[in-house]
Amino acid sequence: MDQQSTLANTSTPSVWKTLFWQGVWKNNSTLVQLLGLCPLLAVSNSVTNALGLGIATLFVLICSNTVVSLFRKQIPHEIRIPIYVMIIATTVTVVQLLMNAYTYSLYQSLGIFIPLIVTNCIVIGRAEAFASKNPLSHAMFDGFAMGLGMCLSLVFLGAIREILGNGTLFDGIEHLLGDWAKGLRIELFHLDSHFLLAILPPGAFIGLGLILAIKNVIDQRNKA
């Protein structure tokens, strides 16, 4: 059980600051807990894919934490995990249908990794460790902070891989945000041949390793 699950039922500024800092940096689900690595490594070959999956996971975390916290006193302890999974699966289905309806190209690009959010340890972990033990407002904000932390990690890794692999940034972002976003695409440099390693799975592992190393260096300097 992490220290967030023991927060008092208060709403002081320090509580919100702690929740936010834990979710985004200190206890980042991707860079500290190393959870949800399968979708992180698989779809982070571009900012568009990374942002799409990050927003979907953020939405699922907020909704599942909200429902679990609302009904935490009514859910029988013995069958709480199957109930949490059902709640998460329902939320993921809603996200999947919305993406299929409004961002179909991105939906096709992300493929199986949208329904796989159901099995993401981040989501079920926050429901069990935090939402089931804390009031609604704290649970919702915890879902937001944890989801934001994962989303930022995804986008940062996706940006690195897209820049190195294709020389672009925000390529295909119109599939997520609409036609108006076509102007956001940036071609940083022209590549006669793509640096395939960056956009293939080995590049994802190398990129994640570099990000983890940078974070550890920053944390060590802050402690000094």
From Swiss-Prot:
EC number, as in UniProt: 7.-.-.-
Bilayer disposition of the protein: Multi-pass membrane protein
Annotated keywords: Cell inner membrane, Cell membrane, Electron transport, Membrane, Translocase, Transmembrane, Transmembrane helix, Transport
Compartments reported by the entry: Cell inner membrane
Transmembrane segments: 51-71, 81-101, 105-125, 140-160, 194-214
Annotated GO biological process: electron transport chain
Protein name: Ion-translocating oxidoreductase complex subunit E
Family: Belongs to the NqrDE/RnfAE family.
One Pfam family cited in the UniProt record for this chain: Rnf-Nqr
Classification via InterPro entries: NqrDE/RnfAE, RnfE
GO cellular component: plasma membrane
Organism name: Pasteurella multocida (strain Pm70)
Quaternary context: The complex is composed of six subunits: RnfA, RnfB, RnfC, RnfD, RnfE and RnfG.
PANTHER family: ELECTRON TRANSPORT COMPLEX PROTEIN RNFE (PTHR30586), ION-TRANSLOCATING OXIDOREDUCTASE COMPLEX SUBUNIT E (PTHR30586:SF0)
Main subcellular localisation: membrane
Keyword Membrane: yes
Role played: Part of a membrane-bound complex that couples electron transfer with translocation of ions across the membrane.
